[in-house]
């Protein structure tokens, strides 16, 4: 079973397109649980609503049974209505949000290039989260965290939390 968190799927940049895991083949769809939500796209996190797509009927039945047993069978009606309204009427919101985010990404890119030239921003293909490469500074994880938290007064997520390939990134 593959649980695919596709909460950032509404955010792609340039010519990039998001392909849902389940759309890649019938075999993939048969083993997939796809999770999306309007929380990132439409700023609705407080309404605690998400979408879970399970094409496989047997898997969907097992999931529903587990959800019911855990006591989560009730739907947040306000969240459900907001989710539906957001996807039905929110295209202009999303268009404006993406323009705003593009400007933010451009600002970070220029700031790093002009003021922090040893750092590199990885150009995002999707999402509004940015990967900043700190490896050229030659710092240990502890030194980098000290620099970021105590000298720059920033709170960033260490790339190491995503595994060895994320080490040196924030």
Question: Can you name each region flagged by the protein language model?
Answer:
Residues 1-23:
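Conserved PLP phosphate-binding loop immediately N-terminal to the Schiff-base lysine helix
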Residues 3, 33-35, 122, 155-157:
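Structural detector of well-ordered beta-strand residues that form the stable sheet scaffold
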Residues 6, 38, 160:
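Nucleotide-sugar donor-binding loop of glycosyltransferases
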Residues 23-27, 112-114, 148:
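Short, conserved catalytic or adaptor-binding loops enriched in Gly and charged residues
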Residues 26, 30-102, 109-111:
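Conserved core segment of the aminotransferase class I/II
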Residues 80, 84, 100-109, 121-134, ...:
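Conserved glycine-rich beta-strand-loop-beta hairpin in the small C-terminal domain of fold type I
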Residues 119-120, 132-170:
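Conserved C-terminal alpha-helix-loop-beta "cap" of PLP-dependent enzymes
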């Amino acid at each position: 079973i593959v649980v695919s968190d596709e909460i950032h799927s509404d955010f792609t940049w340039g010519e990039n397109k998001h392909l849902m895991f389940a759309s890649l083949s019938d075999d993939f769809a048969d083993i997939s649980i796809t999770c999306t939500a309007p929380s990132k796209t439409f700023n609705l996190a407080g309404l605690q609503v998400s979408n879970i797509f399970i094409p496989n009927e047997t898997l969907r039945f097992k999931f529903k049974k587990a959800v019911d047993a855990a006591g989560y069978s009730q739907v947040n009606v306000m969240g459900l209505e907001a989710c539906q309204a957001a996807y039905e009427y929110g295209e202009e919101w999303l268009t404006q949000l993406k323009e705003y985010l593009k400007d933010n990404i451009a600002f970070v890119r220029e700031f790093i290039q002009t003021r922090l030239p040893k750092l590199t921003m990885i150009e995002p293909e999707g999402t509004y989260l940015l990967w900043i490469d700190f490896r050229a500074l030659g710092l240990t994880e502890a030194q980098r965290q000290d620099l970021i938290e105590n000298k720059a007064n920033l709170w960033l997520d260490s790339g190491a939390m995503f595994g060895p390939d994320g080490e040196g990134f924030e």
